[in-house]
UniProtKB/Swiss-Prot annotation:
Broadest EC class assigned to this enzyme: lyase
Gene designation: L3HYPDH
Catalytic site: C104 (proton acceptor)
Lineage: Eukaryota, Metazoa, Chordata, Craniata, Vertebrata
GO molecular function, one term: hydro-lyase activity
Protein's name in the database: Trans-L-3-hydroxyproline dehydratase
Length: 354
């Protein structure tokens, strides 16, 4: 017999106490906390301006929701904002333990479901099997295609990326503790360094997570110190987000290739990393290892979850040859929550432990 305790909607608190309401989801094990209410208005004429405004004026919201005691070191979040693009159904700012990302594929897969289920897109006609959701991310407009039935999300989601391109290949980077390491850098809405884990003395499938994190973080720091990242469209996008360690299986095969992404402040992605899949597909296509519309499966070494990806057409990003990549995966709801922030709480803005 289940026990039940009658509780008020929220614990007793002062009427002026801030309340942050969220929906929690995950995609392949990677969390997404979507803010429904409680975040003050994010000002700015463009999405990138809103991102700067939130970083400068509302960062306490990020810390309260991402950090302990309400979150944890590897929590990920999304604040929905209006977009200046006429075709966008919604704009989104991505939150993590260090700040604000420019792109997040696992979040786009989850937000596709969320947008349909919460009425952020027009109702789909009877018999529609797939709904289209245009999501304005800081890197640009991406289009999600949400499997649906009777107007509700049902099953996997796929999306088409912004133009993805390769910034550098076979870059020799001096990584402390590892010597000279060959690194590729590619962009999938965010810039990543790619290294075969074996080159760092690690087995991507059996190594301890801590060892993978330490190695990836060392690569990220070394690349940031020795190589300048540039983006043809905006300086706001010109930063290295993290390092993805791979099993080195870049040539086309129907078997999954395994990787793990360490981004921001040593945050570990539980999923195969949607924007990382985009960048890795762009890298494989650039090297002639993959043709258009050849689907590859990407497996997370953290959870075993799988995304699929394929380059669907060629494009340009500034002077860079690029591709549009389709990524597919499945997101799930995990719950809802309302968090309060009491003025006399010395830890009200959160904390992190390493």
């Amino acid at each position: 017999m289940e026990s039940a305790l009658a509780l008020p909607r929220l614990p007793p608190h002062d009427p002026g106490t801030p309340v942050l309401s969220v929906v929690d989801m995950h995609t392949g094990g990677e969390p997404l906390r979507i803010v429904l209410a409680g975040c003050p208005e994010v000002s700015g004429p463009t999405l990138l301006a809103k991102r700067r405004y939130m970083r400068q004026h509302l960062d306490h919201v990020r810390r309260r929701l991402m950090f302990e005691p309400r979150g944890h070191r590897d929590m990920y979040g999304a604040v929905l904002v209006p977009s200046e693009l006429p075709d966008a159904h919604l704009g989104v700012l991505f939150l993590h333990n260090e700040g604000y990302s420019s792109m997040c594929g696992h979040a786009v897969l989850a937000l596709g479901r969320f947008a349909l289920d919460f009425g952020l897109v027009p109702a789909t006609p009877a018999g529609t099997r797939e709904a289209r959701v245009n999501i304005h991310c800081p890197c640009g407009l991406v289009t999600a295609f949400v499997a649906c039935e009777d107007g509700r999300s049902h099953g996997p989601v796929r999306f088409h990326s912004v133009p993805a391109f390769v910034l550098a290949t076979d870059l020799m980077v001096d990584v402390p503790g590892h010597g000279k390491v060959v690194v590729d850098i590619a962009y999938g809405g965010a810039f990543y360094a790619f290294v075969t884990a074996e080159k760092l003395g690690l087995d991507i499938c059996s190594a301890k997570t801590r060892d993978l994190v330490d190695a990836a973080s060392a690569v990220t720091k070394a690349v940031k110190a020795q190589f300048k990242i540039n983006h043809p469209d905006s300086e706001d996008l010109a930063f290295l987000y993290g390092t993805i360690l791979t099993d080195g299986k870049d040539a086309y095969t129907k078997e999954p290739t395994t990787n793990i992404c360490v981004f921001a402040d040593e945050q570990v992605d539980r999923s195969p990393t949607g924007s990382g899949v985009i960048a890795r597909i762009a890298l494989q296509y650039h090297k002639g290892l993959l043709e258009l519309n050849q689907t590859r499966a990407f497996k997370s070494s953290a959870t075993g979850s799988v995304f699929t990806g394929k380059a669907v057409r060629e494009a340009k990003c500034g002077d860079f040859k690029a591709v549009i990549v389709e990524v597919s995966g499945q997101a799930h709801y995990t719950g809802t929550a309302s968090f309060i922030v009491e003025d006399d709480d010395p830890l009200r803005d959160g904390f992190l432990l390493k």
